[in-house]
């Protein structure tokens, strides 16, 4: 244990060295400074294309980034022509483009060169909105890069020095890799929602994270839900966006009443709900609370898949590969119900395969856990309900008697009917009442109208369906 402790300490400081020194070597080895030029004191020229160009003369020092400081009610687009010295001391020119969000009031452009001069071009209407431009050289700490380096070094050390243990317990290998990769993904995403319909899933999880029947929406929450959060191109901009979100979270723009009951279709958000609720209860910043919501989802889904690998007697490597697929880890690290569904179905199917292939009689505990995992996993994705029918394939020699077999399969049939009824009956009720129910993720789809059309024009619908299937199965359309 002492050796492992010393190794962890060494790897920690080595990771800091790599992130702060090696990955930012040019910034580290050159002088640290910050020099400001007021735009009003700089020579400018207007051209016939309706643009204004500012000329900035510099002294050839290394510049890591250039900051634009402005006050505007609209985004500002700019072009930069940077004259710099290459490794041979010769002058070269590179052109950069930037779009600055009016919400931040400043923008950062990565340069990474020894700058001789700069030509900054903006539209005439934006010229009077620029206040100053700042040439800087400094290192910027990145949690994502640090954690990536730390995880690679630490996991490599552990897997090599404790290969016997991880060879016998592959589930722990999976758990450590999944949590490490998922956390890096969460930190790399910064403040953007990159998964499919993630802003809608976040809205549902945030709403349900309020325990009582009262909830508040801050400006930061509404900005995420309405996709109004600025996007950053540099680490500095991402830090500024985080500060802006934390400040915007102090402004409440909407408060309303909500139901206390969590619908069964939304129970897949429980890990995210717990993370968001805990962060708000502890008084964490908005950015940290959102991170906690994603992180709890990652922990829960990783724990479920870890259990699937642990208790499965067959296909452990296959489960590990599926659990570490890029899309799987990405979903585990996002606001979505798909991660919850995938993890529980993996557990349910893994236990079913173990039960099916084992030579012993059916194990009640293992079977019940498998069925429960499938049922809960299908709450938000009814399309996976037929997976329960797999238990009809259970061989007769798995049961102690014919009566036990019949009761078991009858119970599975009843469970299937109940699961199908849980979403079919409400849909039929909406059709008979004329209520319009669509996809809660948005769009113009209407489940009610679609089902009404099918029931009202069965022959026409059958023709459309067959034509669509024929087109899909046509050899010319298959890639």
Predicted regions and their residues:
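Transmembrane-helix motifs of polytopic, lipid-linked glycan transferases
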Residues: 161, 291-314
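Interfacial juxtamembrane loops and adjacent helix segments
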Residues: 210-291
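Membrane-lumen/periplasm interface segments of multi-pass, membrane-embedded glycan/lipid transferases
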Residues: 250, 426-479
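Transmembrane-helix signature of polytopic, membrane-embedded enzymes
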Residues: 284-287, 306-327
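Membrane-interface alpha helices of multi-pass inner-membrane proteins
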Residues: 330, 366-382, 387-393
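Perimembrane helix-loop-helix junctions
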Residues: 352-361, 385-419
